[in-house]
Amino acid sequence: MGRLFGTDGVRGVANADLTAELALGLSVAAAHVLAEAGTFAGHRATAVVGRDPRASGEFLEAAVVAGLASAGVDVLRVGVLPTPAVAHLTGALGADLGVMLSASHNAMPDNGIKFFARGGHKLADELEDRIESVYADHRTGAPWDRPTGSGVGRVRDYDEGLDQYVAHLVGVLPNRLDGLKIVLDEAHGAASRVSPEAFARAGAELVTIGAVPDGLNINDGCGSTHLDLLKAAVVEHGADLGIAHDGDADRCLAVDHTGAEVDGDQILAVLALAMREREALRSDTVVATVMSNLGFKLAMEREGIRFVQTGVGDRYVLEEMKEHGYALGGEQSGHVIILDHATTGDGTLTGLMLAARVAQTGRTLRDLASVMERLPQVLVNVPDVDKSRVTSSAELATAVAEAERELGSTGRVLLRPSGTEPLVRVMVEAADIEQARSVAGRLADSVKSALG
């Protein structure tokens, strides 16, 4: 059995890779591992379980709930809610464990399981490894320790979760959104009820699209991975801005009043300046990944804000933030973490904070986002090469050094081995697109020559 946990939980095609048996087994294993770690010591354990609206979530939820209850864990079933809502409720309700069933921005046939520890933070890698180990042992014959009688877990629906989460979101806003007209695209996903309710309570006039989930249409031509519908709707309705989420609403992208995209880097830049103005940007520092556009780094330096870089993945951003006490971080893809108010990327919170900045300043989102200029970026995938030698090849190091000399301070090069495929990703940013394409093409040839 290969490693089940990826960078964002366990994912796969529902009922093929991710079966009811696997969901049940992992849930029992998680309960045993947390009990073993002392998480449940001295009290009866409780878990919060939520899901996005994809059809497979119904049977997977049943499997997870059965697994937890059979291991003696009481379950609060919160139904269809965003991933950050499950994380928030895990902390707010004092639960020992949170479980979210979602494959985020993936297509409908996929699904996933993500576990949260007490307080609403993602499980540490070592706990995920231990869960896999306990689950594997059981598959090869090791028996579960099963409670009986009053020791089994009890299950109840917790219908107050949505209202509790929305109240939290609106309660942390620095100002209201009165006077703003906003288009929301909910990707027919987990925020289809939450996000419109939160924006309406905050005072915005709303046009909502992609908010009629039927279990099959999640992320289908809408949401943060397909912005064309949102762009058209913003222009058609004369809105001030548009906000798009993905299937589990842990990310947010935006559209300005002209229909132009505002990506995660630009959102981070706008929020960084707003938070510094409120003295909420601790250490005047923002955290982002190596995939952030160089224009973001240059803009932050120009504004006197320190930029800390991590590996790709919001979990690495979060680790850096927690270790050093930073308040803001995120990714170009729209995962934005505002650590004073959320334990993970929260698309609805991000959208609300962005809209609040527009309302507070009276400036357009286009004007606010112009604080950074996105440099042209070219990404080339080079397949069928020995990706393990990316950092050790002298020939490749020479080619990269030559490219960096050519680009100077207004460009950069990043070579990144894929985590799942035998390929290397070549990313080049430059002052103009033609130079970026030229340098990327030459570097791709060098990768083939050196690693092929």
Swiss-Prot record:
Catalytic residues, chain numbering: 104 (phosphoserine intermediate)
UniProt PTM: Activated by phosphorylation.
Cofactors required: Mg(2+)
Domain of life: Bacteria
UniProt remark on cofactor binding: Binds 1 Mg(2+) ion per subunit.
Known catalytic reactions: alpha-D-glucosamine 1-phosphate = D-glucosamine 6-phosphate
Residue numbers carrying Phosphoserine: 104
Gene3D superfamilies: Alpha-D-Glucose-1,6-Bisphosphate, subunit A, domain 3, Alpha-D-phosphohexomutase, C-terminal domain
Annotated GO MF terms: magnesium ion binding; phosphoglucosamine mutase activity; phosphomannomutase activity
Function: Catalyzes the conversion of glucosamine-6-phosphate to glucosamine-1-phosphate.
NCBIfam families hit by this protein: glmM
Name of the protein in its database record: Phosphoglucosamine mutase
Natural source organism: Streptomyces coelicolor (strain ATCC BAA-471 / A3(2) / M145)
Gene of this entry: glmM
